[in-house]
UniProtKB/Swiss-Prot annotation:
The gene is mecA2. Belongs to the MecA family. GO terms for biological process: establishment of competence for transformation; negative regulation of establishment of competence for transformation; negative regulation of sporulation resulting in formation of a cellular spore; sporulation resulting in formation of a cellular spore. Homodimer. It comes from the Bacteria. The N-terminal domain has binding sites for ComK and probably for unfolded/aggregated proteins; the C-terminal domain interacts with ClpC. Enables the recognition and targeting of unfolded and aggregated proteins to the ClpC protease or to other proteins involved in proteolysis. Acts negatively in the development of competence by binding ComK and recruiting it to the ClpCP protease. When overexpressed, inhibits sporulation. Also involved in Spx degradation by ClpC. InterPro entries: MecA_C_sf (IPR038471), Neg-reg_MecA (IPR008681). This is Adapter protein MecA 2. GO terms for molecular function: protein-macromolecule adaptor activity. Signal peptide: none annotated. Keywords: Competence, Sporulation.
Amino acid sequence: MRLERLNYNKIKIFLTFDDLSERGLTKEDLWRNAPKVQQLFRDMMQEANKELGFEADGPIAVEVFSLQAQGMVVIVTKEHQEADTDDEFRDEFIEMQVTLDESEHILYEFATLDDVINLSNRLYNLDVTGGKLYTWDGRFYLWMEEEEQIQLLKADFIAILAEYGNPSTATIYRLMEYGKELMASQAIEQIHNYFVKKQNLS
């Protein structure tokens, strides 16, 4: 489980499917308002309080995004509290919305260009050459369509990506509107040729 504060009243939690399995849950369970799902959110809120100082001291809205083989991203937003309550985790204060990403694309974000360069070296050596590269708000984003991943099993592909970056909940449309497209196609090959291959020749 990885936690990240997005702003003063919103956090992002990334759960792998192993995280769910350890708690006796499956992806499909998150579509049901079962007691063990409520317990999962209580555990997440306690962890968020401990790691980020994020206190769920009122009603919260929970958005769950399924990212294919990558896991689940949970966006928790603390909403305005109309009245005080002694029980900060009452079930009626949890508004849950689940969004299933049915598309076969993969979108990962990276903190630095070096992370993208190191990733491209790994993938190029495994005959993966495609992808689009964007930058937005100081971070880098790699978008891959399903047909660009066929050289690897998806689970293996995700495992390599996870060594260098994190799954992103941004959409390609947001990147197109607010970000800057650095490479429109064959991003892995271009990065490898420009940064890795050129460096090896020098």
